[in-house]
Amino acid sequence: MNKSFICIDDFYEDPDSVRTFALEQEYETSGNYPGIRTVPHMTDSVEKIITDAINLNQTYNFNGQYCGSFQYTTAYDRSWVHADGTTEWAGVLYLTPDAPPSSGTGFFKFKEGGYTRYTGDKDMDKYIDKCSQDLTKWEKITEVANV
């Protein structure tokens, strides 16, 4: 069965120390996302939690471009709709204490065709990417709050 969302409560025993560690890192990587990121900091224990949670029964390369990276964003960072065409799953772990209720991650459907992921049609996918900054072309279908 394909799951859309998996929520893991209390992911870290001491999230405050992880947050302190994250804030002490160098943030210099920017890309197709708001804010800035660090180099990856994947640990064996985090890898095991993720592997067990999403039932990975094959070897997965956690040494990829962003696995385990910390990302720093502020209220001033502009967000947009985007997808990663080569990614089968994504994980987001919030470390902001007392975050505003409006923070979190939204999931959208492209109004033209109802797509929630890339189609595999290069021309259509390029068009969808081109529309990523025009929120009138998207419908928010759900949101995962920063709690």
Tell where the protein language model's regions lie, with residue ranges.
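Non-heme Fe(II)/2-oxoglutarate
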Residues: 1-81, 104, 111, 127
